[in-house]
Amino acid sequence: MFDGRNSGHSSFSSRGDGMHTPEHELAGHAAPSTRRGKQNRRSDMEVMKERFAKLLLGEDMSGGGTGETSALALSNAITKLADSMFGEQMKLQPMYPETKENWRKEMGWLLSVIDHIVQFVPSRQMGKNGQFTEIMVTKQRDDLLTNIPALRKLDSVLLETLDNFKDQKDFWYVPRDMEDADHNGDWRRDENWWLPVVKVPTDGLSEESRRWLQNQKDSVAQVLKAATAINAHVLSEMHVPENYIDSLPKNGKTSLGDFLYKSITEESFDPDYFVSFLDLSTEHKVLDLKNRIEASMVIWKRKMCQKEKDGKSQWGSTVSLEKRELFEVRAETILVMLKQQFPGIPQSSLEVSKIKNNKDVGQAILESYSRVLESLASKIMSRIEDVLEADRLVQRQLMGEAETRSESEAESEYEETEKVVAAETPNSRKLSDFIGWRLSSDTKKHSSMSDIEFFHKVEQEKEKPMMKSPRALPKKFSYLAKLENMRSPSDRH
């Protein structure tokens, strides 16, 4: 059977020598790429069918009905896809072309679901008679219509940022096992011990490279900020599960603890001072603080809603509605600061509970997509900061060497100056020359003495002629002695 698509019903193709070649031979030699393209499309279709079959069954291929909800299945699919694509992104380098293509292709499959998440909106339609009639038409949901294009743009910015490091030669990476010999295995104590070590030139990065890296970091920081905002907004719109509410204590003070509750409920509250005063040295402590604050916020919100509904709280409380709103604002401010200070912090108990119990497919897609972009942006920022930190370390070493060299040069200059002065004045004057002494012939024999010893000896010789013998001193008579010689006349009898 032949294919006659080229020229009517002809089964042959003409050649320049007048001979004819069967069409199937041309297909075998001239279109291998076409066959490969068809095979790729067929394999893509098979992969997509398998992927969506798992999603429809909730990852339960047995069909027993024990699978996850569609929302959670989509959320997990996006999370697993991002882990497989970006999990090995340990260096500042472009993604492999195949990896990038697979990421965009499979994300396109998963995001195609949102085309069917619509809402009814009123519209006007002109009839045949020229009159307008109000009808209801479908439109993509507002949150998806706004946030999905924004997330796609953030996705493209992050991939372009990685592509910008394609031809850079200002820094490079060394495996950790090579550093092990130099540091005697101390690198395993580092929290990121699995990452390769960044190396920069011995004189550090150039000023141009440093500015370029800082610009890349600022760009990624904007992406991180936008993705975090979208993720936080979507999570705030999700319903709080009942099983999470049942696990909460009766009041926010019990959830926070005495110290945190007293700090948040004081009259004067400074969030910056409060966060700086806390012990946030480990990831576990940060996550524990986040869980406590979120639990107290849920408790306060429920009490406020119950008080507005019934006029009083079912749990009973002496705290006014206005103060509870103020406490909630303060707690939310602390949460925002924690997310900004620790962008890679794990999900809290409330967030995990919301994601697991969520049944809105659109919210599940928005939350998971923004979360994986937030994680990728945080990872890229951390890799850029590693390069800048390596450069700062080299700069500090150079400054220390320069200071040491300047001190040694100053000491050597001082020593050379002393030598020059000593060479110019060979006959140095002694202490006796400055005082004005003149050595006589009698004292020249003592020239071997030191100046201080000679000084004391001369002073003793000066004092000797001034001391006269006691015999040479004139006898002194006191006034009382004179009176003693003048006695009263004795009686003459």
UniProtKB/Swiss-Prot annotation:
Chain spans, region Disordered: 1-45, 400-423
InterPro entries: PRONE_dom, RopGEF
Gene3D superfamilies: PRONE domain, subdomain 1, PRONE domain, subdomain 2
MF (Gene Ontology): guanyl-nucleotide exchange factor activity
Basic and acidic residues composition bias: residue spans: 17-27
Superkingdom of the organism of origin: Eukaryota
Name listed for the protein in its UniProt record: Rop guanine nucleotide exchange factor 10
Species this protein is from: Arabidopsis thaliana (Mouse-ear cress)
